[in-house]
A protein has these predicted regions:
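C-terminal catalytic/substrate-binding lobe primarily of soluble NAD(P)-dependent oxidoreductases
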Residues: 1-193
Length: 193
């Protein structure tokens, strides 16, 4: 069942949050390109109020993509819902708190088990002041811009189709620091895995 698996995970400067195990397409290419990975998971947080809204939308049929007849017109419930709900771009001013995106890694190095955590927190308010958008949009747009810049500078350019993890990560990580998404590292900490 969707959102069936969840547990509390602690996020830096945020604290514990109920985190849900989800599918994310990035996991497919990561395990393909790093075949020694034994387990890769994607966790995301949702507030209970948000989840309640999602359940209600699903239960009353508004998440459907199947057309229905309404007053002699064919409409798609999900498209109708999108038309009547506020534009997410208009909500950024009221967002508070931070996003937290990271990788929690456990493995063997030099015969010993180690953990490594690399993460970034992004303030919704700071992102809004800079761009007029909230932190989720910021943490989506800045890495995409950096990837395009890596390509245009020839740092990430070779014949064929490649995933980002197949390129040198160092210039990308340096650019994250430069363009507003500084990252932090924790070595051999408790990762709640």
């Amino acid at each position: 069942q969707p959102l069936e698996f969840h547990k509390d995970l602690t996020y830096p400067n945020i604290g514990p949050r109920d985190s849900y195990l989800l599918y994310h397409e990035e996991l497919e290419s990561l395990v393909k390109n790093f075949p020694t990975i034994k387990r890769a998971r994607f966790w995301m947080t949702f507030g209970q109020e948000y989840l309640t809204h999602l359940r209600v939308i699903q239960n009353i049929g508004m998440a459907s993509i199947e057309p229905i007849n309404y007053n002699g017109m064919e409409i798609v419930p999900l498209q109708f819902l999108k038309a009547v709900l506020p534009n997410p771009q208009d909500l950024g001013e009221n967002y508070e708190g931070e996003t937290s995106i990271g990788c929690r890694i456990r493995g063997i190095k030099d015969g010993k088990e180690h953990t490594y955590y690399v993460y970034n927190n992004c303030s919704h308010q700071a992102a809004y002041q800079e761009t007029g958008m909230q932190g989720v949009s910021y943490t989506t747009g800045v890495p995409a811009m950096i990837g395009a810049m890596m390509f245009l500078k020839g740092l990430w350019k070779r014949p064929g189709v490649w995933n980002v993890e197949e390129f040198d990560p160092d210039p990308f990580m340096e650019a994250l620091n430069k363009y507003g998404l500084p990252w932090h590292e924790v070595f051999d900490g408790d990762l709640e895995l």
